[in-house]
Amino acid sequence: MPKRGKNYSNKSQSFDKQQVYTLEEAVGHVLATSYAKFDETFDIAIKLGVDPRHADQMIRSSVVLPHGTGKVTRVLVFAKGAKEAEAREAGADFVGGDDLVEKIQGGWLEFDKTVATPDMMGTVGKIGRVLGPRNLMPNAKLGTVTFDVAKVIEEIKSGKVDFKVEKAGILHAGIGKISFGNEKLTANALAFIEKIIQLKPSSSKGVYLKSVTISSTMGPGVKVDPVYLRALVKK
């Protein structure tokens, strides 16, 4: 965890940390309390009324943010033949099969996302123990095991964010950069929240969207009113 000093303390006192705000107000406070000398990531943390220990309440998916993430994502694609050519043309950073498997087995991991055509999963399985713990394994639920490689590469490059609910129903993601400004960050946050609400399991009872907090990498968390968000998404 980053070390926090006087700047964090001073900034966190510029708003009421116990109050909940509209999304636009909360983003404004995050921008006002950002003090780092680098372009901080805009983070969102959501507490959901689900129990991920139950398979039917495990939420794992992805969303393409309207303004991207601000990060350069290196995409590796396992494909052959025409699909290999398609992946290269679509802008994949690395494309191959057994050659990439051998390279990864040797310790090379200079990529951020992986995609595989279904016929390559037998090959990819050889390095499952390497990719799996690092959340780099192609996954059909996330759309990264597909023959439509060009579409997926485009989505990843344009700002596709994968997410998964963790213990205690907590879900978090980086959904932009502070330099984006209020309008773009608000739009990204709303798109992310809309996706989460769409994924509500039928077995989830009671309040689903319990709390939402946004922050910059080094800044204090700002609470967003979940009631306001639910009403906003329904409009």
From Swiss-Prot:
Annotated S-S bridges: none
UniProt function note: Binds directly to 23S rRNA. The L1 stalk is quite mobile in the ribosome, and is involved in E site tRNA release. Protein L1 is also a translational repressor protein, it controls the translation of the L11 operon by binding to its mRNA.
Assembly and oligomerization: Part of the 50S ribosomal subunit.
Keywords: Repressor, Ribonucleoprotein, Ribosomal protein, RNA-binding, rRNA-binding, Translation regulation, tRNA-binding
An example molecular function term from Gene Ontology annotations: structural constituent of ribosome
Gene3D superfamilies with a match to the protein in the record: 3.30.190.20, 3.40.50.790
Protein's name according to its UniProt entry: Large ribosomal subunit protein uL1
Residues of the signal peptide: none
Classification via HAMAP family: Ribosomal_uL1_B (MF_01318_B)
GO CC terms of this entry: large ribosomal subunit
InterPro entries: Ribosom_uL1_bac-type (IPR005878), Ribosomal_uL1 (IPR002143), Ribosomal_uL1-like (IPR023674), Ribosomal_uL1/biogenesis (IPR028364), Ribosomal_uL1_3-a/b-sand (IPR016095), Ribosomal_uL1_CS (IPR023673)
Example of a GO biological process term: translation
Gene that this polypeptide is encoded by: rplA
PROSITE patterns: RIBOSOMAL_L1
